[in-house]
Amino acid sequence: NHPEERLTASCIVYSRLRREIWMIGDCQCLVGDNYFDNPKPTEQLMAERRAAEAHRLMAEGKETIESLLVHDSARDAIIPQLIEEMQNQNKTYSVIDGFTIPRQKVRVIPLDFSPWTIVLASDGYPFLRSTLEESEKALAAQREEDPLNIGKFKATKAFHPQKNSFDDRSYIRFMV
């Protein structure tokens, strides 16, 4: 019973029958111009701690932006808390990990019968926009301006120089 060893996934689903969006795990969506997300309860706190640690390490001259991009020792500092938080999978937040998902932890967004443009996405887009092109541009701007993700947008991970993002990305846009 070690959740940190389990494969986990997030999922966002549109139910045509129920006219609902179901959010399991950390994902996000746009319904028209309305933004919805479903972050893990302590994700922002962990991101803030990582950002503070990165700023401290750089202020003390122990690390640089470049060195942190290669080996993120600020992330290393929060790994124990991230692992500890995994004990709460499908208790305080929902994920797909092979165990029962508590229905009350699935975020449900009901839709009326108006026509809607819907965007469903993973949390790999720090700034979700109404088109994939705009979302990718915002991601590229984030990478250029703050590759460590410790400024305006804070994350538990930085961009890695050999990868094109800091997290998984999925995006779909459709109309109902």
Where are the regions a protein language model picked out?
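Serine/threonine-rich low-complexity intrinsically disordered regions
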Residues: 15, 41-42, 64, 71-72, ...
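Catalytic core of PPM/PP2C metal-dependent serine/threonine phosphatase domains
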Residues: 1-30, 66-111, 174
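C-terminal catalytic subdomain
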Residues: 77-176
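Surface-exposed beta-loop interaction hotspot
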Residues: 30-85
